[in-house]
Amino acid sequence: MMTVRLIAHTPEPEKVVAAAAKLCYSDAHITDLLDGLDEEKTAKFLTMLSDLGHASPIEHASFTFGIEGVSRTLLAQITRHRIASFSVQSQRYVRLDDFRYVVPPEIEAIPEAKAAFLASMEEDAKRYLDLAHKLEEGHTARLMAEGMPEKQARAKASKQANEDARFVLPNACETKMVVTMNARSLQNFFHLRCCSRAQWEIRELAEKMFGLVYPVAPHIFARSGPACVSGPCPEGKMCCGKTAEVRAKYASIKEAAGV
């Protein structure tokens, strides 16, 4: 089950962004940047930035998420968003004795497909652990033959075994990560990944992340979501044709945030 938490963010992110904008458009000194930046003036600066398309000040606000229960398939997609920082659970240093995996909804919905998928995952788990054990025993024997004490040899062999045994793990295998993005990168991420044409798992993640950051910085993310929330759909012939429904959905999310 996917779990997402907002574990840290820039303190007063909207005020920080407004201060950066104030510096750009006035002769204010660094020591005076925060003076007079009440909620109303902060909101005006942020609206101005959005109207002008001046996005660089928004980069001063960052958000850090803890994410688990997602697949390695998702990992391959989210790391394409390059202006971000990722720390991912290592399959090299962590032995996956408790093999967890993500079942796609379309597979879950078809009993025959689900049965075949679960059988495949069970077989993959067995092969992974069997291969890891064989590699560990082989590496231990080699290291001991080279003169290394058994306890030290087994510790080193275990890590070496994980390094190669992981090659049999499927894309469905669960992973955990900590991800940090600045607000501008998040806007782009939501623009692309909240779209109904995005792959289902990363779309679910993007929607959860949006739901977490919007209450913290509602003016920064006022026009965030899929592209059609704030303008015409850019997908052309690939458009889902549900722009009105999507806009209503995101209006509801924002209303529920109570800000």
Q: Language-model segments: what does each one mean?
A:
Residues 1-259:
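Family-specific signature for flavin-dependent thymidylate synthase
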